[in-house]
């Protein structure tokens, strides 16, 4: 009795403190996505567990595609009439997720929604999952990312595995084309819905270093029937027989990909539906697959889920569009070789002139080790000399980025270093050509803030 009374007081004070902190920070014009949760957890360390009770929760984790997959799922839930909230501001650590639950709950700790859609950082997932009894866990993929923070891919995979071990009641939605992700089925008892793509996406794709070239069981080199990107595709081990499992939700045909969208055919249990995916890029086809798998777990009709893919709003910085100085600007977050090469795959389809900008930071959220840029096939852009008008580099490590482009073969006079974000946008849009900006995470936040203030767009958290 005394414990329950004490816990109720702690919950009340923690939620109150969180709401007050969030409101104050927003009044000051800041994001306030993480700090309010840290304050709340100081008062009540178990706050997330108390607030998440009785809330049907789906968690999305993995290296690439978490935010976009979450936005796709969000649209399908909206169209299906589900009452939910989501951490769409990108606060995906324990403190940020706790803050989202708190601001969507009453002061007594009662959530105002029946469902929650939570994007979780892959390293934070094992902590978040201790407090949230998820109905489903969506694992997008596992790639090498921020070596100083995550270590090698097997370490990231272990973090996800531990998180799923905490999620004993969850159905797993797992990428069948990722040999690392698919291996989770071998070591965990959870039911699994596999998703994947049955065919190559690009006929002329960027050649990449594989993050998982060897069998996770016996260490023999994989043989691929086809590759979609990175180490994803139709893998099989000729030594022990480990191979890509047959996905329940899969793309059977890629009908078309262009600058604006992709058209595909989805199949689930023998039933096929066409879908137009509102964002371009092969990696967004995978994100759409993950969304369709999550919809299956939630009992959402396949046609309704497919239709939602044509109308969802992209996450901030994820193929986000702006109109600046009569030029179309598209911002595409990058953070590792696999994701960056996928952006290059997208760009190499262009036949019209454009301006390219890369903004490289080395803060904790970006990864302090920026050596990964040397594993990206920027040389591929040289083949686009006729349509690539100018290259701009910016950010804390702009000089490193400029050096990388020099080694890729671009003449020095074509590489413009501009560390001031406002001036960068003015110069890059000066020719009125389409501009494609590739920033790392903290560069994206800073650049996004500059665009909001200077050109009248909303802040990322609004």
Model-assigned labels for residue ranges:
Residues 140, 173, 287, 291, ...:
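Residue-level signal for inorganic ion chemistry
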Residues 34, 55, 68, 92, ...:
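Conserved active-site and cofactor/substrate-binding residues in soluble primary-metabolism enzymes
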Residues 63, 88-89, 119-121, 141-142, ...:
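Fold-independent oxyanion-binding glycine-rich loops
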Residues 2-196, 204-214:
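Phosphate-binding loop of NTP-binding sites
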Residues 70, 126-128, 148-149, 182-185, ...:
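Short glycine-/acidic-enriched loop or helix-start segments at secondary-structure transitions
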Residues 2-26, 31-33, 219, 232-234, ...:
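ATP-dependent carboxylate-amine ligase
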Residues 73, 77, 97-101, 288-298, ...:
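Buried hydrophobic packing segments
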Residues 3, 193-337:
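Adenine nucleotide phosphate-binding catalytic loops in nucleotide-utilizing enzymes
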